[in-house]
């Protein structure tokens, strides 16, 4: 297994993982309401491409959650390549699609179809949420509000009450975004 994950890092460290993992900021505490700072029960920490590759390489199951940030980065083809590489290593790969991720409903479906991600790997929120508790790694790429747990219980949040993809229930969650600031695209 170490050879498999090392191979993934060697093959993609410069091309793929540098695109995906290169823009992490400093570690910070995350509060239970999804905002930065305050009372915490989970700690956010930066990881480098090697640590990310090892987490993904040792996983049995990975759910990729694309968002508007993936669209802006035009990374859908790179994301598909990552999924294919993980599948070659025996990892079960799925894509979780929030109905309003991106700039319009269906935006992520269109981008992933353009990148030739098999439609059978795309799962809508209602179907995939029950699976997150059994997922080894949830990989969130450029999604903010559609995974923010503040929508569940922070009545002061502008997204309070919005259904979210429950990535926080996965064993590990990797969030790829440009900064640690909160953001609603």
Where are these regions (language model features)?
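Single conserved hydrophobic/aromatic residue that forms the stacking wall/gate
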Residues: 1-12
């Amino acid at each position: 297994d170490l050879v498999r994950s090392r191979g993934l890092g060697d093959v993609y460290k410069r091309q793929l993982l540098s695109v995906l993992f290169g823009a992490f900021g400093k570690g910070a505490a995350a509060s239970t309401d999804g905002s930065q700072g305050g009372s915490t029960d989970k700690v956010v920490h930066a990881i480098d491409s090697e640590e990310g590759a090892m987490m993904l390489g040792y996983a049995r199951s990975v759910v990729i959650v694309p968002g508007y940030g993936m669209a802006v980065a035009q990374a859908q083809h790179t994301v598909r390549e990552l999924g294919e590489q993980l599948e070659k290593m025996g990892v079960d790969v799925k894509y979780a699609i929030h109905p309003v991720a991106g700039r319009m409903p269906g935006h992520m479906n269109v981008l992933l179809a353009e990148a030739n991600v098999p439609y059978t790997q795309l799962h809508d929120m209602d179907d995939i949420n029950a699976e997150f508790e059994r997922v080894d790694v949830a990989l969130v790429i450029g999604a903010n509000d559609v995974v923010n747990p503040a929508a569940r219980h922070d009545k002061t949040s502008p997204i309070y009450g919005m259904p979210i993809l429950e990535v926080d229930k996965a064993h590990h969650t990797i969030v790829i975004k440009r900064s640690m600031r909160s953001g609603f695209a």
